[in-house]
């Protein structure tokens, strides 16, 4: 995964001849993400709280031919797109998967947002609810900014989660299935593993929002520094913790699984009614299982200083 870096200067070509300049494209992507975080008015909690929604981004890359994308048809659902299917849905072009790269990113919630939500025990803090609604609107804008920047550099890209064909629907076995799961895509791109409450634990923790695009370019993939899809979770990897179980206000998280219906009912109508009544805007959210837990802001560490991934706490 990559810390965001300085990008190309204005007018600097991102392509060398007919071949994509991998380094220039990578710099461009990470520059656009950093510019969004530092300067975009879309990175905002909205309303009277004129603060950024996000900080500390990370970017990861995965080959469109990575076999794990096919495995997501089992893990998420048979309707989950491969990168080639997503690119075809957005462009009408049939492109070999090895010619595509999935670019995924992590946007960390701000310390103030996390601190506020840490204090709650039933409903979301206002900053958290604003992050969920207005922050996600900004994240959607980042998808568009990246696609536009790549297009101007001669690289076609699509944002699967913004395509009109994208669906989220009920499933008798999995409760809800989607055409493109940002959590699972980020996992493939080396950005994190899953926790007991199903959130993705990243180097920026679990109190994050995620996004991704599919680009018609071959970029170096990010190594996956884990062996299993739950490696960073202290409960799954060490048999300890379970803090998110205690944080869930409706008992939807347990050591034997997650009651997704109970969680969904708490979100809507439960938190929606609360947010509209108390904060005065149409929104919802919870995130209690993502805050006030060891994996809130990092890959968690045990008392002996060892991380769930097996190394030092960092």
Mark where each language-model region is:
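Non-catalytic, usually N-terminal nucleic-acid engagement modules in DNA/RNA processing proteins
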Residues: 2-7, 11-132
